[in-house]
């Protein structure tokens, strides 16, 4: 009984143990691998806390969500994108989508897909809000005399030039599924399941940060987009609604990009 109580007491402070271990390993990494201390400590702490508090399903979904883009980047910059590369990409893509959906269903963080989770009016309102914040950021860009684009968008435009349009379009549209599953559902239903305010703030900032903002304009662009999508999920807790709004917005951007091209 004593040992059980002692272990239970120790479990309350597992975060302290994780952070201490992360700092120790980071110090070793600096001396052996010459890695940046603070970034290494932060990454190890986050990963350690995820496992310590049994949140590893989020980490799995996060890794899966990055596989298609990782494959595309490797193929595009190592050599000319071949037919075999395209086939491999779509195999990875399908496995990623299917695996992510099945993992999320098994973890019971999203319901089984059904038409009732696709309310047309709410989807239209969500899209309209994204369109509105896009106009606002465009006006802001004119006020500060800046080109209405971001480094992340420039990188995507460059990638578009060297990969097949089918691959680029698939990646763009799939972001609606993968990013909402990781940055909205994963944060609200796994990482901070019982802390809605922490969940909201984390989802808001993490989504914006992962899009690589480099200045005030890009932070505003992705921050406001994240605010709309995070607010939508916080209010309705409907993954399929968020996915639809995000996918529709990306489809709109894709069509505009193809027309301008």
UniProtKB/Swiss-Prot annotation:
User: Subcellular localization, per the record?
Assistant: Cell membrane
Q: Which domain of life is it from?
A: Bacteria
Q: Please give one Pfam family short name.
A: Rce1-like
Q: Keywords assigned by UniProt?
A: Cell membrane, Membrane, Transmembrane, Transmembrane helix
Would the keyword Iron-sulfur turn up in this protein's UniProt record? no
Instruction: Tell me a GO biological process for this protein.
Output: CAAX-box protein maturation
A molecular function annotated in GO for this UniProt entry is: endopeptidase activity
Residues passing through the membrane, by range: 15-35, 43-63, 84-104, 123-143, 197-217, 239-259
Q: Enumerate the InterPro entries for this protein.
A: Rce1/LyrA-like_dom
Specify the protein's topology with respect to the membrane.
Multi-pass membrane protein
Entry GO CC:
plasma membrane
Name the family the entry cites. Answer: Belongs to the UPF0177 family.
Q: What is this protein called?
A: UPF0177 protein YvdC
The organism of origin for this protein: Lactococcus lactis subsp. lactis (strain IL1403)
Gene symbol here is yvdC
